[in-house]
């Protein structure tokens, strides 16, 4: 009986993680790629749309309030404190998204932008709590399953906020689309409220000094500056492109319905497939070899943009181009995430993961914000040519990474 109950508790915890991961992916895209379509239809130029990437700057600093969040959520109230923080973070996200829909980005630019920053802030808190839920609810040997559940829920949220929102926008206004997306978060909120949390271990409260110990431990690593530089530059191509592919597809004549199915839905499937294959290749090849190869493959995907621009703009060509772009993007993701874990010490893994993901996010914000300028002043042809060469800095740095990072 006890064994059956434990198994039931394990399965229900996995299901809980899957469901609460859904709002994370949904909100992530609402203030990212999907937002660019709304801004485009509101008359904003590519430069301004690119600058809206700066609303996510708040994610860079999430490692600073991580220890504070642990103190507030875990120390006084234990399970209830953790649940209350989850509820407050998600309710705040839903509320801010709803408030956002009451502002027109053209006539109420500053309130609109401030609402986006608020959504980004509360979503960063929700993401941290979501990541910790796996460690609190699931035993170590089952983290692989819980990560798969978390990724699945997150990707479903991205799919709904991408393909679903884009398709809905052809029927109703963008304000109503965002209201509908906010409503879709409510089932996850209700589950958080009613679900009985059972932590597998007693919660250990980290001291604030732990962050500084974790930081010092990281900077003691051999060639840590090269490790950080590689982390900043590895996804330079994707960060430089940012949301500009959305603008490109619209400029060359594709409709939002075309993009909802071909770019968002089909592209998401291609990314997931590439991620699984990339994960398998991590077990087969040394990192130094694999990282170089996937960087080159993904760099070549820029040619698909030029193919569409100069030669063929039918639906079949869109699907082929999107598959090439998103599949190779997926290939690059698994080795990179594994690389991030290899950079962490086991005893400081949570704090250091928060730290290095914040570092990686700097590249997303910095290069994403200038993508609009680059696309405007270079034109689409040279913009995608430059994007294709963005792999070179990271490719060069691979040979200088310490062996414990890139050796199998």
From Swiss-Prot:
GO function terms (MF aspect): transmembrane transporter activity
UniProt topology in membrane: Multi-pass membrane protein
Stretches that traverse the bilayer: 11-31, 49-69, 84-104, 109-129, 154-174, 177-197, 224-244, 261-281, 294-311, 353-373, 378-398
Signal sequence bounds: none
UniProt main location, coarse: membrane
Domain of life per record: Bacteria
Keywords assigned: Cell inner membrane, Cell membrane, Membrane, Transmembrane, Transmembrane helix, Transport
Pfam families assigned: MFS_1
Subcellular location: Cell inner membrane
InterPro entries named among the record's database cross-references: AmpG_permease/AT-1, MFS, MFS_trans_sf
GO cellular component: plasma membrane
Family classification: Belongs to the major facilitator superfamily.
Protein name: Putative transporter AmpG 2
Native species: Rickettsia conorii (strain ATCC VR-613 / Malish 7)
């Amino acid at each position: 009986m006890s064994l059956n109950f434990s198994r039931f508790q394990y399965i229900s915890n996995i299901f809980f993680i899957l469901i609460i991961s859904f709002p994370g992916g949904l909100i992530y895209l609402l203030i990212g790629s999907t937002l660019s379509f709304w801004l485009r239809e509101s008359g904003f130029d590519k430069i301004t749309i690119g600058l809206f990437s700066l609303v996510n700057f708040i994610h860079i600093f999430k490692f600073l309030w991580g220890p504070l969040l642990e103190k507030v959520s875990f120390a006084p109230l234990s399970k209830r404190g953790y649940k209350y923080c989850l509820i407050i973070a998600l309710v705040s996200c839903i509320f801010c998204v709803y408030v956002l829909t009451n502002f027109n980005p053209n006539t109420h630019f500053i309130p609109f932008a401030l609402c986006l920053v608020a959504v980004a802030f509360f979503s960063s808190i929700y993401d941290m709590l979501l990541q910790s839920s796996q460690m609190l609810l699931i035993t170590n040997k089952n983290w692989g399953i819980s990560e798969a559940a978390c990724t699945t829920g997150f990707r479903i949220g991205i799919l709904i906020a991408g393909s679903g929102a884009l398709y809905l926008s052809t029927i109703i206004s963008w304000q109503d689309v965002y209201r509908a997306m906010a409503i879709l978060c409510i089932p996850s909120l209700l589950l958080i409220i009613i679900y009985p949390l059972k932590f597998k271990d007693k919660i250990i409260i980290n001291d604030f000094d732990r962050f500084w110990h974790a930081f010092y431990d990281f900077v003691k690593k051999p060639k840590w500056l090269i490790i950080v530089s590689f982390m900043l530059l590895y996804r330079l191509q994707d960060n430089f492109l940012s949301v500009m592919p959305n603008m490109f597809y619209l400029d060359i004549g594709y409709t939002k319905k075309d993009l909802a199915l071909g770019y968002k839905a089909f592209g998401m499937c291609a990314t997931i497939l590439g991620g699984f294959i990339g994960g398998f290749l991590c077990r087969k090849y040394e990192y130094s070899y694999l990282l170089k190869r996937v960087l080159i493959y993904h760099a070549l995907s820029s040619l698909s943009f030029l193919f569409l621009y100069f030669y063929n703009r039918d639906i079949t060509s869109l699907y082929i181009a999107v598959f090439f772009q998103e599949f190779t993007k997926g290939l690059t993701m698994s080795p990179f995430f594994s690389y991030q874990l290899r950079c962490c010490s086991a005893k400081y893994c949570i704090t250091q993961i928060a730290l290095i993901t914040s570092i990686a996010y700097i590249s997303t914000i910095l290069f994403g914000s200038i993508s609009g300028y680059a696309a405007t002043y270079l034109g689409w042809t040279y913009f995608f040519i430059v994007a294709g060469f963005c792999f070179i800095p990271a490719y060069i740095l691979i040979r200088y990474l310490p062996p414990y990072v890139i050796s199998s």
